[in-house]
């Protein structure tokens, strides 16, 4: 199945998430050091070279020296599409198994990477491929290649029944976690409706419980022997590396791995529908949602690029036709989105709309059909084509800033190579977008969207567990003959262990340059000239805490309204102008402040700043837009309350801080239905005048500019800006006392297959001298994958997909929160384990060990050189420097403090938390969890609703 279980978002900024435009078929291995095609004129490019080992491993190399890191990205051409009946979920299960150590590196695969400061490490599986990726310091590349090659060539001896059972349990809890979310079963239904039983995309990537339970150790090993060889993989190395180095190291570590069978890929099968179909389902959701899906052209077809542009015009932006009609004119929905998502055998065009309360979904469907038919008949306008093209080209420019991670340059090259055989196929996609016309876009839409689609309508009601397909006894897995590919003599003696990393790159952070604008604002600039983009963030006081004594949610709502029309431009015109410039503008609030953000293409910096200034200085706050956003906002609060995590994080803050405290509000800052419902234009204007003003504000600029260039431009647009009246004082955030004893609050979620457990307490401010020490203390207990809580509940007990703890930043006391989603029948046991771990750690009974502290120091310190690869990461760090009055060299001082920490200091910092004063919030099916939790005798137990109000009649 090709559907993601995450909510639909706007089409990804990088156009390369879509199908890329070369024909599918057998992989073509280009000669070494040869690039397939020249870049499209005027475009940002990803230069690469490549070679292929004798055993079939294809290696692609991209050099980018801006940071001393290398992205290692390996794609195996196997996914859920390759699973036979009775073995669903095998590809995803193996993704997990391959993180559990190999023959020569037993234990957690993450550990050696953590020790060298690797960043962005992850693995994913979808219908078509499995990938693993990480960014490592250049000096740790040997370690990374040794580890990746060991699990490719030396894994099976490390997989035993215990490991299989452990990871099977983790995967099953991942499945429960996804299905426990609102709309969480939708994509399983869509897969079944869009593809016949015989189609490789019919079943879900995560598989069925029955097949997961039936997986035998020999089945799993034979699956690996079939698919995970060098001749079925593409390795991309991007960053601080060159071709010669890559050749030497890859041959050394991978060259002796024998090839596996050459497996034929399934034929392209778009599974077109001859006519429209529909289905309905009920779920524990706050509002009706409409999904409409078409099967469309596969990866590698220019039509899919054209459909991306079609999607952008139809429903891909705030000024799209469906947004204009359904949100602005007819006011029938709270949100609408479209997207085209590529896959190897056939892609999907996806539409989703959240129907307003009280609106007949049939009316929404009728408007969707009307607008779709109009666009298919007449095509987009020239302006719409130009704007859509600019949006995607700007997104590509922003996306290629990163060498690794989701959508980074290594990901782009691997995706192209695996699915089209041409690592440079993104250039074809760019060319298609450059050459697209209104007629070609309309024609592509007509070819695919005039065919049958499936509509699924989800309405509020009971959640009914989906029946799984009947269990099938799988046919014996017969291994095909292995190709007699030549391999080299082993280049390393693996019995000597993992290569050591003896040195690490120096931390480099951009020099912060400062200036003053004529309006009194401070400018802080960090130059970054790797891509032609400039990012700006105007930082103000007045965040959620400013809502205290006023209507909760005012700060977030007011800031969110700034880009809904400004100056002479109404909401739609403002969106159109931003898209035509390729600019991203937004504004929002956080606990202690607010900010307005601009990402501008260098070529359009001046007009983008002009639009940005209009947004901040002259927001329109039109009543019709207030009414529209208010309705959507209230619906969003309903969505928060329907999600287990969202409900808990709305209820917890008032319990930690006490009613009336500036922080005693939902951590989302969204307010309540009542407070948002009572907001009027005067409230928004008052907030904007009081807090969005240049005095005491800071403009952070990161990107392709200089102080000499940017200050005159900022003065041009903001120099004469003055605040009205006296600026209000920053809200005083007083400390609160902890409760005298443990408290437990339960929120009912009938029928839930998981319980979501939260435990919280207040700890000192981010400005406290001991804040860094506490951050390391938190990392040991729950702030890292290798932490005590996660190793216990996920890796040892496999009751949870992941347990963690965190301490968000705050000027006042910070909330420390531990959390874990667990299988419903292990709720009380999981709480008992969490309580034991927390009590033993924070009381000093089982204090942090030297090894634990050293591990967290290594993770924090050695990852720093790679942490500032992107302008966004630099911008965020400067934002913290500004908000918390830190020195400009804070990143270096923090590094030095972490390096100097001892276990005794971390133990003392951990003593900040009092395990006897914890507040527990648990969301789950009370029929299953209430009695076992009460039997734990943690403390007083209260039953509350998703607003934190006592439930009448509860014990």
Feature map (PLM): residue ranges:
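A common structural junction motif
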Residues: 149-159, 253-261, 369-380, 615-621, ...
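Bacterial N-terminal signal peptides that target proteins for export
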Residues: 2-18
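M16 family metallopeptidases and their MPP-like homologs
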Residues: 60-62, 67-85, 89-93, 107-154, ...
């Amino acid at each position: 199945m090709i559907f993601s279980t995450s909510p639909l978002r706007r089409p990804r900024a990088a156009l390369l998430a879509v199908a890329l435009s070369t024909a599918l078929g057998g992989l073509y291995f280009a000669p070494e050091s040869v690039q397939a095609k020249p870049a499209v004129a005027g475009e940002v490019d990803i230069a690469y070279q490549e070679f292929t080992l004798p055993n079939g491993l294809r290696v692609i190399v991209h050099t980018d020296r801006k940071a001393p890191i290398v992205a290692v990205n390996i794609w195996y051409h196997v996914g859920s599409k390759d699973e036979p009946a009775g073995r669903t979920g095998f590809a995803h299960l193996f993704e997990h198994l391959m993180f559990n150590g190999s023959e020569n590196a037993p234990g957690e695969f993450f550990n050696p990477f953590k020790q060298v400061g690797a960043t962005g490490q992850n693995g994913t599986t979808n219908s078509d491929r499995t990938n693993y990726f990480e960014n490592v310091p250049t000096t740790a590349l040997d370690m990374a290649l040794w580890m990746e090659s060991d699990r490719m060539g030396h894994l099976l001896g490390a997989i035993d029944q215990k490991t299989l059972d452990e990871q099977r349990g983790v995967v099953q809890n991942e499945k429960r976690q996804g299905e426990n979310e609102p709309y969480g079963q939708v994509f399983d239904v869509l897969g079944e409706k869009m593809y016949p039983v015989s189609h490789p995309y019919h079943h879900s990537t995560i598989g069925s419980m029955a097949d997961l339970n039936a997986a035998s150790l020999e089945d799993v090993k034979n699956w690996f022997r079939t698919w995970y060889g060098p001749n079925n993989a593409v390795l991309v190395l991007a960053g601080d590396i060159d071709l010669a180095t890559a050749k030497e190291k890859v041959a050394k570590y991978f060259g002796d791995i024998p090839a596996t069978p050459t497996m034929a890929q399934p034929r392209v099968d778009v599974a077109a529908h001859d006519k429209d179909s529909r289905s309905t389902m009920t779920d524990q959701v706050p509002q009706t949602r409409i999904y409409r899906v078409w099967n469309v052209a596969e990866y590698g077809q220019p039509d899919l690029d054209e459909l991306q542009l079609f999607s952008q015009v139809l429903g891909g932006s705030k000024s799209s036709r469906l947004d204009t009609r359904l949100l602005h004119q007819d006011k029938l929905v709270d949100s609408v989105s479209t997207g085209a998502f590529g896959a190897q055998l056939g892609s999907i065009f996806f539409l989703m709309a959240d129907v307003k309360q009280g609106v007949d979904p049939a009316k929404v469907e009728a408007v969707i059909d009307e607008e779709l038919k109009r666009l298919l008949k007449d095509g987009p306008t020239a302006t719409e084509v130009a704007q859509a093209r600019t949006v995607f080209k700007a997104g590509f420019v922003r996306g290629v800033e990163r060498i690794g991670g989701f959508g980074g340059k290594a990901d782009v090259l691997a995706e192209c190579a695996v699915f089209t055989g041409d690592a440079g196929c993104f250039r074809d996609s760019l060319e298609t977008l450059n050459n697209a016309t209104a007629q070609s876009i309309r024609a592509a839409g007509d070819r695919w969207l005039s065919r049958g689609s499936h509509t699924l309508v989800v309405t509020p009601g009971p959640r009914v567990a989906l029946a799984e397909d009947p269990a099938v006894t799988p046919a014996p897995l017969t291994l095909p003959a292995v190709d007699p590919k030549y391999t080299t003599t082993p280049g390393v003696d693996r019995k000597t262990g993992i290569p050591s990393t003896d040195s690490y790159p120096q931390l480099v952070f951009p020099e912060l340059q400062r200036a003053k604008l004529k309006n009194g604002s401070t400018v802080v600039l960090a130059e970054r000239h790797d891509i032609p983009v400039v990012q700006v963030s105007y930082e103000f006081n007045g965040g959620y805490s400013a809502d205290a004594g006023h209507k909760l949610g005012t700060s977030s709502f007011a800031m969110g309204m700034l880009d809904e029309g400004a100056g002479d431009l109404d909401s739609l015109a403002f969106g159109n102008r931003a898209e035509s410039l390729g600019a991203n503008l937004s504004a929002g609030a956080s606990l202690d402040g607010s900010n307005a953000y601009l990402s501008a293409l260098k070529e359009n910096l001046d007009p983008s700043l002009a639009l940005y200034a209009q947004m901040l200085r002259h927001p329109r706050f039109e009543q019709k837009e207030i009414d529209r956003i208010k309705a959507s906002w209230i619906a969003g609060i309903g969505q928060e309350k329907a999600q287990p995590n969202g409900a808990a994080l709305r209820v917890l803050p008032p319990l930690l801080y006490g009613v009336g405290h500036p922080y005693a509000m939902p951590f989302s800052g969204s307010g309540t239905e009542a407070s948002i419902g009572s907001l009027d234009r005067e409230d928004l204007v008052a907030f904007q005048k009081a807090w969005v003003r240049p005095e005491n504000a800071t403009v952070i600029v990161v990107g392709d500019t200089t102080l000499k260039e940017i200050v005159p431009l900022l003065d041009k647009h903001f120099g004469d800006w003055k605040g009205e009246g006296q600026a209000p004082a920053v809200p005083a955030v007083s400390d609160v006392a902890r409760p005298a004893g443990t408290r437990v609050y339960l929120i009912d979620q009938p029928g839930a297959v998981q319980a979501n457990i939260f435990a919280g307490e207040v700890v000192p401010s981010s400005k406290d001298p001991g804040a860094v020490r506490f951050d390391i203390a938190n990392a040991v207990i729950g702030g890292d994958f290798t932490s005590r809580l996660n190793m216990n509940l996920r890796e040892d007990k496999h009751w949870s997909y992941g347990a963690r703890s965190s301490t968000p930043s705050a000027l006042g006391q910070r909330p420390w929160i531990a959390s874990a989603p667990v299988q419903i029948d292990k709720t009380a046991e999981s709480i008992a384990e969490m309580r034991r771990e927390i009590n033993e750690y924070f009381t000093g009974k089982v204090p942090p060990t030297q090894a634990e502290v050293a591990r967290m120091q290594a993770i924090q310190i050695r990852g720093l050189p790679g942490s500032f690869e992107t302008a966004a990461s630099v911008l965020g760090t400067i934002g913290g420097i500004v908000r918390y009055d830190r020195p400009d060299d804070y990143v270096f001082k923090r590094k030095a403090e972490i390096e100097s920490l001892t276990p005794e200091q971390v133990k003392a910092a951990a003593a900040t938390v009092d395990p006897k004063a914890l507040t527990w919030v648990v969301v789950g099916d009370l029929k299953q969890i209430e009695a076992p939790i009460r039997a734990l005798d943690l403390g007083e137990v209260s039953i509350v609703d998703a607003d934190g109000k006592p439930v009448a009649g509860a014990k």
